[in-house]
Amino acid sequence: MNYGQIALEKHAEWKGKIEITARAAVDSAEALSIAYTPGVAAPCLEIQKNPEKSYELTRRWNTVAVVTDGTAVLGLGDIGPEAGMPVMEGKCVLFKAFGDVDAFPLCVRTHDVDEIVRTVSLLAGSFGGINLEDIAAPRCFEIERKLKECCDIPIFHDDQHGTAVITLAGLMNALKVVGKKIEDVKIVTSGAGAAGIAIIKLLMAMGLKNVVMTDRRGAIYEGREGLNPVKEEMAKITNFNREAGTLADVIKGADVFIGVSAPGTLTQDMVRSMAKDPIIFACANPTPEIFPDEAKAEGAAVVSTGRSDFPNQINNVLCFPGLFRGALDVRASDINDAMKIASAKALAALVSDEELCAEYILPKAFDPRVKDAVAKAAAQAARESGVARI
């Protein structure tokens, strides 16, 4: 099936995948006077006295902005804000379908970090949360950090944290399958961009101790020449044995491989050199670092990819709709590690001990339990960690 051609035809037919639907009927002079002037002045004045009332008297409580500069759209690269619109509209559809969250695309015509931060911060009063999307590394880290400092609503870069949450959920169950613990295993990652770094940070928050990151030049370690500031930071908290060399060198004896890099990065020889019953998360899309049958032929116990046509898909739609649903429900000021970890645990728990096996470590995207399970866990973690406001 030619999905590209079909998508072109359907997008031309749809003329946009989202639209505004009015909740207030304006079918009489009286109704008009309530929804607009003169009646609308009363809620305006209430919000003026207490801006928090904007959550009760407008749709702000359920709205999220999906913000991009179009610099890292899917695998297409820097295609610009207008070309990124179909993806952002699609993201908004997923927010609504899987989380009942009203999301709106904001595609900005600048690559300047401070301009993006200023633009989004000025618009923050209209939204209950901000989802950053398809912004290239390392700028995405700075943009997220600065927005978190100046905004009092959740700022969430899904390419980083959504991927990290699903990876953690899948890894928790994969480790159960092979009978290993996160604090005991050695993990080697390929890809030191937004997703790769966020995955490692969240896994370390869960107790991971032994992890080696690799990029195109090989292992990342403290003192390696040519590291950007973000990789320098990661070098200080990972690879404590200062392992050097290529991916093939450092993966020997590793228990887990996590790839968010490029097709074909992991070879069968590398899998063969890993510890017994290795776990392989090959998440490059659409072509993984290694195909499941190739990895299993060399002894891989559990294999996960980013594709829906293989078992154990790492799919962000399992995370961001429910996580934002929970954050919005308690009017959270942030989405923190506690909420991410709680969401991952909730996802992992949807796979029962009886169901858990090498071919089934994560619930399916269309599992109707996902939204409520993640939302409830995220909301509770927000309350316990002090970022909930209701």
What are these regions (language model features)?
Residues 158, 178, 282-390:
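Adenosine-phosphate binding glycine-rich loop
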Residues 232-301, 307-309:
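Rossmann-like adenosine-cofactor binding region
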Residues 1-155, 375, 380-381, 385-389:
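N-terminal ligand-binding/catalytic initiation module
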